[in-house]
Each structure stands twice: as structure tokens, then as C-alpha cells.
């Protein structure tokens, strides 16, 4: 039996690149309606064009800090994917806003989920909860070494989910996403990801900038794989559990930069600058066994293939935007 077939599902932050990709997969799996609650600060309506072609998508422009907006969005749905959050950089710049979104906003979602008898919540956490590694690879029992407000908010979210499960038997799973990349990344926002900045530089014939020695490592996971994990978490019997979502592969910024230059066909060399202190975690690599065992999920898009797909999407998106501006679309 397909538990998604014919259901109504809410995605907070659903116009973002993870939320919108999850919406695509939910509609492919037979969801009758996908609701999107998004304030469109980071999310983009373009990201939902594919989903709208697949099925019934209802977009509610609203903020998870607004209790009425959340309650109206949750009413009548079977499941909730809670993706709405702030970037780690924004949390550092605006601590009060971070608390309001990550804590108060999540509280609104959970309260409404209980009130309207939601069957399960699938929540976005982050590998940021781990901070600097005590050991590698990081499993789900790794200590919380986080020293960022964003990570603190995600730890609090996990504990809130656990408490609501204990108090109200609200089923949930939470995913500690590692370093997500892929189509629908923010290509023109204030806080563009390092990959997008590098692609912009390469396109302009300028060397991509690496801040620090380039030995900082991450575990990159393709957005389609992340969305598959989300869906797997919904349909699985697992509840009151957290899972890593990564490839289980450690990639340094140096390696990432040279791979991007390679797939871009560029002969440029990276340019090194003094390290910037925003998130100074030196290494990340996930263990993936728990998700494989309990959810049957394993990420399968390797980094080089994913980078090629990202570049193709970026070129297509820029072409479409240029055509729209030129009035030829």
C-alpha cells in the first residue's frame, strides 16, 4: 500500500530548493494535494513550476511565525514536511529573528499538527548540530559540539519533536542534512552558496576564491537524494528517530573546486584568501547505515555527476530568465 496516494501534504518552506524537489516527488508518488507555506524570502515561485504541472499545488504566502497562517495551512492535511528555516549566516546576523523562526515558528507547526491530528511530521535538521567532529565519520550518536545559533536551533527542534512525541504521540522523523547542492539552489540571492559563487567567477573568467587553506571538508549530497530521503522517512514505519542524510564521502574545498573547474571545462586556478569565520567546522562525513537499514535509503548521485546536473540547470535557468526579460518567452 502506498501511504502517500490520495493524501494532502503541507511543506513549510516548500518554495525552497529542497522543499520544491520534495513536492515533485510527493506528487509523483500520488499525493492528491501539496500545500506550500512559504514567505518567499528565500523560496522562489519558479521552483514550483514543475510541481504545478504534476498535480494540485496550493501556495500560501505566509510565515511560520504567524500562528493563524500556520494553523490554516495545517488544517486538513495528512502529513507535514517542516523545511522552513533561516540560513546559518542570517542566524548569526539576526539572533532574535533566528529564535523567532527556528523556535517559535517550529512550535507553531507542532501545535497545529497536534490540533489537527497530523499523521506524521518529517522535519529538516542539520549536520550543524555536530559542530567540529569528535570522530569521523559522524553517526547519529555523535555529541552535539555545535557552536552556532543555527545549530542550536536545530538541536532545539529535535528535542521539541521528541517532547511532542512523548506528550502527544505525534509521530516524526528528523533528518540531519549534510551539505546539499543541486538544481534550484539560490543563484541570485544575497547569500549564495560557495558553488554558485565559484560558477559565477568561472563564467566571468575569474579565479574561484577559496577562503582559508581549502582543507576544510564537507559531505556533499545531491538535492534529489535529499528529497528521496524525505519521502522515505514519511512512508517508513520509523518514528521518534533522527537520521543522517549524506553521501558518506568527505570532500575538501580544494577537491570540490578542482572538480568544478574540470566539469566546467576551465583552465583557471583557485585563488586563496584569508579564512572567514562564519562556520569554521573543519570536517564533515556522515555515516549512512542507519538510514539504509531503517528507511531503505541510500544517496546515489556522485559529486561529479551532480555538479554536471547543477551546471546544466543553471545554464538553462539563466537562459529562461534572459528570454523572459527580453519578452521572447
Question: Over which residues does each language-model region extend?
Answer:
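Conserved C-terminal active-site "lid" loop/helix of NAD(P)H-dependent oxidoreductases
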Residues: 223, 276-298, 302, 309
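Conserved mid-core alpha-helix of short-chain dehydrogenase/reductase
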Residues: 69, 108-112, 220, 225-228, ...
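Hydrophobic "lid"/C-terminal helical patch
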Residues: 22, 230-234, 257-260, 307-314
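Glycine/proline-rich active-site loop of Rossmann-fold NAD(P)-dependent oxidoreductases
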Residues: 155, 180-196, 206-207, 211, ...
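Non-catalytic, hydrophobic alpha-helical segments
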Residues: 80, 226, 230, 245, ...
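A short C-terminal helix-loop "cap" of Rossmann-like NAD(P)-dependent dehydrogenase/epimerase domains
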Residues: 54, 141, 168, 196-210, ...
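N-terminal Rossmann-like NAD(P)+-binding domain of SDR-like oxidoreductases, especially those catalyzing
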Residues: 1-180, 301, 317-320, 327-329
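C-terminal "lid/loop" region of Rossmann-like NAD(P)-dependent oxidoreductases
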Residues: 213, 242-243, 251-258, 265-283, ...
Amino acid at each position: 500500500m502506498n501511504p502517500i496516494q490520495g493524501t494532502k501534504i503541507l511543506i513549510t518552506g516548500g518554495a525552497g530548493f529542497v522543499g520544491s524537489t520534495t513536492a515533485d516527488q510527493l506528487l509523483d508518488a500520488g499525493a492528491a494535494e501539496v500545500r506550500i507555506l512559504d514567505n518567499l524570502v528565500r523560496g522562489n515561485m519558479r521552483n514550483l513550476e514543475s510541481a504545478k504541472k504534476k498535480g494540485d499545488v496550493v501556495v500560501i504566502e505566509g510565515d511560520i511565525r504567524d500562528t493563524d497562517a500556520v494553523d490554516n495551512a495545517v488544517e486538513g492535511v495528512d502529513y507535514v514536511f517542516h523545511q522552513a528555516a533561516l540560513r546559518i549566516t542570517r542566524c548569526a546576523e539576526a539572533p532574535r529573528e533566528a529564535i523567532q523562526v527556528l523556535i517559535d515558528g517550529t512550535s507553531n507547526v507542532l501545535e497545529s499538527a497536534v490540533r489537527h491530528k497530523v499523521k506524521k511530521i518529517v522535519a529538516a535538521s542539520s549536520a550543524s548540530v555536530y559542530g567540529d567532529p569528535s570522530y569521523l565519520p559522524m553517526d547519529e550518536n555523535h555529541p552535539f559540539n555545535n557552536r552556532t545559533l543555527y545549530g542550536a536551533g536545530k538541536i532545539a527542534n529535535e528535542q521539541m519533536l521528541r517532547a511532542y512525541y512523548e506528550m502527544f504521540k505525534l509521530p516524526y522523523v528528523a533528518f540531519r542534512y549534510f551539505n546539499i547542492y543541486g538544481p534550484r539552489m539560490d543563484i541570485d540571492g544575497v547569500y549564495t552558496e560557495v558553488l554558485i559563487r565559484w560558477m559565477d567567477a568561472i563564467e566571468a573568467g575569474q579565479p574561484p576564491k577559496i577562503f582559508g587553506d581549502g582543507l576544510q571538508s564537507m559531505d556533499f549530497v545531491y538535492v534529489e537524494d535529499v528529497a528521496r530521503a524525505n519521502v522515505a522517512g514519511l512512508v517508513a514505519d520509523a518514528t521518534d528517530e533522527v537520521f543522517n542524510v549524506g553521501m558518506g564521502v568527505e570532500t575538501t574545498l580544494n577537491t570540490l573546486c578542482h572538480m568544478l573547474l574540470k566539469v566546467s571545462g576551465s583552465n583557471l586556478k583557485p585563488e586563496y584568501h584569508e579564512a572567514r569565520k562564519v562556520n569554521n567546522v573543519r570536517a564533515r562525513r556522515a555515516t549512512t547505515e542507519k538510514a539504509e537499514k531503517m528507511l531503505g535509503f541510500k544517496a546515489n548521485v556522485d559529486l561529479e555527476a551532480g555538479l554536471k546536473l547543477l551546471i546544466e540547470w543553471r545554464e538553462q535557468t539563466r537562459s529562461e530568465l534572459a528570454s523572459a526579460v527580453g519578452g521572447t518567452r
